[in-house]
Structure formats: C-alpha cells, structure tokens
Amino acid sequence: MSVRRLAEDTVQPAAFAFSKENAAWAEATIKKYPEGREQSAVIPLLMRAQEQDGWVTRAAIESVADMLGMAYIRVLEVATFYTQFQLQPVGTRAHVQVCGTTPCMLRGAEDLIKICKKKIASEPFTLNEGGTLSWEEVECQGACVNAPMVMIFKDTFEDLTPERLEEIIDRFEAGKGSEVVPGPQIDRVYSAPIGGLTTLQAPEPVEEKKSVRASKAKDEQAVSVPPSNAAKPSTATDVTNPTLKTPATARKAAAKNVKIEGETVDKSKPAKKPR
C-alpha cells in the first residue's frame, strides 16, 4: 500500500471551522453514539469536513480530534488510511476519479485517462489553471458491469466513451455539473442489459377471480373425510391387542387344551423333533 501524507505546509490553511449548518449536523451526529463511544463519529465528521472544503486539511483533522476528545495522531491515522479522504487540494468543481481496474481497463479506461490529461492536467492530483478541476486513477468503484466509469465526488458516471467524458468535464468546468444525470450514460437502466431486458418479459399471469357464491357452493359439495389413524404410532401390545384371542400371560395354560385339526394333544407322548 502506498504511503499517504498530508499536503505541504505551504497549502495548508491556518484554521478550520465547520459552517453553522455543518456544526449543527456534527453535534447531532455525535449524539447518535452511546456515551463513551462518541469517537466512532470520526469518519462521518472527516467526510463532512472534506465536503465543505474539498479536501481534508491538517486544521480539519485537529478540529475533529478536539470535538471528539481524541489524540491528533488517532484522527490522522484514520484520514491517511482511507483513500476516500483527499489529503491535498483537489478541483473545486470536479475531482475526477477514473477506475483503472481490469474490467474498466479492458473496456477503455486508458482512453478516459487520456481525456483527463488533455482536459485537466498531465499528471494526477494536479490542479488545472483555474484550480477547478483535478483527476486521479483509482481502484475498483463497484460498477464493473457498466465499465468504464468515473466518480466525481459522490456520483458515478458509467458506460462512458471518451467523447462523453469530455462533455461531462466541460459541464462541470462551466459550473453546470448538477445538470449531468449520474449513472449509465447510454440506454441502460442501472445494470440491466444494453438495449433493455432480454428475459422475464412475459406478463405476470393473472389469477382468475371467482365469485364468493361459487366458492361457497364448491365448499358445500366437498365430502368430509373422517380423520385417519395411519400416521399415528401404534400403541397396541400383546396384552391389549383385541385381534389376539388369548392374552400372552395365558398362552402356556391354554396350549394344554389346544386342538390341532380336531385332535387333542397327548402330553404323554414325546414331542417330535423338528427335522
């Protein structure tokens, strides 16, 4: 991971203070966290400071640290760790982040970088003459299916061509960036296929509506079936089973009187051995 440091002292402002509106927002944000956990608001407060000034200054880091009762080094660690925080001045009207990861690169990200070099500056993190525009190459921004794409502040502009990116940069430079609709720049809806859906186009089946009278008549015609014991476990035993004529306890005594094919068993004769 590359080392991230604060900007030179020559460009650092002497002080930082939230605007009245942002100060009220910051106080409300801090109160959302439990007592003793207020330091968890460090990331949203740093992000709001960046939105206000365009980048995170040393004075902003110190101000946020004082608000949260944190050591300066702890807030500095957060600001330098996350690449979403800009640590040096960027364009006041647009900072273009060009995705250069594999999907976007295969779809033409290099051509978008050429446009940035042409329209803004030859090197990343370099302001144009008016200080209104800057650019950088970043890693994946999560819109791979709509590659290539760029992010300007919080908005993504996808399915770009070099010509379309050039038009977008011109609009931001003219102070009309809010007029550019973010998202796919072609006839695509979010991440749907180009040209529209190719599947799931059949209309949903409409369930046939039945009258209450017909449903009631059908219910009356239904034959009631008595409950079945098929699924119930058997609790019958040799003693309680009604299909057995003689209980198990009396079988030995009853065997003396059993007749086999009309003949009485003679106990005086030895029993035949089984073959």
UniProtKB/Swiss-Prot annotation:
Reaction catalyzed: a quinone + NADH + 5 H(+)(in) = a quinol + NAD(+) + 4 H(+)(out)
EC number: 7.1.1.-
Comp. bias intervals (Polar residues): 231-242
Binding site for [2Fe-2S] cluster: 99, 104, 140, 144
Residue stretches of biased makeup (Basic and acidic residues): 206-221, 258-269
Gene Ontology molecular functions: 2 iron, 2 sulfur cluster binding; metal ion binding; NADH dehydrogenase activity; quinone binding
Superkingdom: Bacteria
One protein family per Pfam: 2Fe-2S_thioredx
Record region (Disordered): 200-275
Compositionally skewed regions (Low complexity) per UniProt: 243-256
Cofactor: binding details: Binds 1 [2Fe-2S] cluster.
Cofactor annotation: [2Fe-2S] cluster
UniProt keyword terms in alphabetical order: 2Fe-2S, Iron, Iron-sulfur, Metal-binding, NAD, Quinone, Translocase, Ubiquinone
Cross-referenced SUPFAM superfamilies: Thioredoxin-like
Entry-linked NCBIfam families: nuoE_fam, PRK07539.1-4
Function noted in UniProt: NDH-1 shuttles electrons from NADH, via FMN and iron-sulfur (Fe-S) centers, to quinones in the respiratory chain. The immediate electron acceptor for the enzyme in this species is believed to be ubiquinone. Couples the redox reaction to proton translocation (for every two electrons transferred, four hydrogen ions are translocated across the cytoplasmic membrane), and thus conserves the redox energy in a proton gradient.
Protein family: Belongs to the complex I 24 kDa subunit family.
PANTHER family: NADH DEHYDROGENASE [UBIQUINONE] FLAVOPROTEIN 2, MITOCHONDRIAL, NADH DEHYDROGENASE UBIQUINONE FLAVOPROTEIN 2, MITOCHONDRIAL
Official protein name in the record: NADH-quinone oxidoreductase subunit E 1
Gene name linked to the record: nuoE1
